[in-house]
Amino acid sequence: MLRYLTAGESHGPQLTAIIEGMPAGVPLLAEDINRELARRQQGYGRGDRMKIEKDQVEILSGVRWGETLASPLTLVVKNRDWENWSTKMSSLPEFRDESQAVTRPRPGHADLGGALKYGHRDLRNILERSSARETAVRVAVGAAAKALLRLFGIRVGGVVREVGGVVATDPAASFEYIWASAGQSPLFCCDGAAEQEMKRLIDDAKGSGDTLGGVVEVQVIGVPPGLGSHVQWDRKLDARLAMALMSIQAIKGVEVGIGFETARRPGSQVHDEIFRDAARTGADSGGAYYRTSNNAGGIEGGMSNGEAIILRAAMKPIPTLYKPLRSVDMLTHEPFQAAVERSDTCAVPAALVVAEAVVAVEIANAFLEKFGGDSVQEIRRNYQGYCERIRTL
């Protein structure tokens, strides 16, 4: 089982992740993780903090000479802005200064609910941990999961599908081509005309103190059939992936395959017909079985079916507005405008990178459940045996 915990506040000294269950023998270098961290910091519409933070990971345990050891992995991402917050965010009681307390909750954020739940009078005690800054270290965890999956021909990528109501379409091309094309775009978008309109909307929103959300699409290729299970509710792969995506800050909805469109079509236009070709032998394509459509998004009955896994996640607009909405001061109980924290106008491109990361972790977890071993060698032996078996079915 692959599991992890993260710790750290947005303006604390660092973000930390501890990963348990990574097998021995996975090639992993800091630069591999740093590439993913750099992708997260890109994107049209990001705020001034991205000019301060140049995220770099430190691997403190679990790796020796460029390979995982099977012991817990500890990954650390420093917050470069910490020096400016070392007093406000100090763990020492002598630095307490309640005159700087944040008392005006932002609509759409964790501020109010967290304050009521935990009894905090200073909303900074909530907003620091609930901030999307935490996703930096989750991207680092996802990079480690991607490194494992690559050893077995499984790749995770994606595109920005929508920003502010502008919908992008992809060219009729391979996923690899689409990912490479999206990587050249400041919005991770393959549709040039849509990208220009998205950028215009982001500029308009920034000028008016507003924010924009959108939709990201994560695609996983090379996945063998049989990950997940139908036998219990909490083992269903689509349920687990949906939970992983919904755990990302500001994500409010998830679709698998064509998702909600299935509710609008008759069954004959939804379900993917099954064909067999004995010449097809790859486990990632279901052995000899294949489909000519993929409305299911690669998952049926809670299990992968050998087709590409397609997931979409809807991100709401960031709740920190430079033209703030109405709120109530929790100290005086008087109506006020909500507090303003440094933030982005549009973080949809960053959300795509985070979405890829959490999906990679869950796919890796399901893969290890199915083919698990203490080392890459053991897992490869188990995986190859499975591939040979399904070729005969």
Swiss-Prot record:
A GO biological process held by the record:
amino acid biosynthetic process
Which amino acid positions bind FMN, per UniProt?
A: 129-131, 249-250, 301, 316-320, 342
Q: Which GO terms describe its cellular component?
A: cytosol
Reaction(s) catalysed by this chain, per the record, are: 5-O-(1-carboxyvinyl)-3-phosphoshikimate = chorismate + phosphate
Pathway note: Metabolic intermediate biosynthesis; chorismate biosynthesis; chorismate from D-erythrose 4-phosphate and phosphoenolpyruvate: step 7/7
Instruction: Name any cofactors this protein relies on.
Output: FMNH2
**EC numbers, comma separated:** 4.2.3.5
Keywords attached to this Swiss-Prot or TrEMBL record, sorted alphabetically, are:
Amino-acid biosynthesis, Aromatic amino acid biosynthesis, FAD, Flavoprotein, FMN, Lyase, NADP
Q: Which positions are annotated as binding NADP(+)? A: 40, 46
GO terms (molecular function) for this protein are:
chorismate synthase activity; FMN binding
Q: Which InterPro entries match?
A: Chorismate_synth, Chorismate_synth_AroC_sf, Chorismate_synthase_CS
How is the cofactor bound, in the record's words?
Reduced FMN (FMNH(2)).
Identify its protein family.
Belongs to the chorismate synthase family.
Q: How does it assemble?
A: Homotetramer.
The record's function comment reads: This reaction introduces a second double bond into the aromatic ring system.
**Protein's name in the database:** Chorismate synthase
What organism does this protein naturally occur in?
A: Pelobacter propionicus (strain DSM 2379 / NBRC 103807 / OttBd1)
Gene name of this polypeptide = aroC
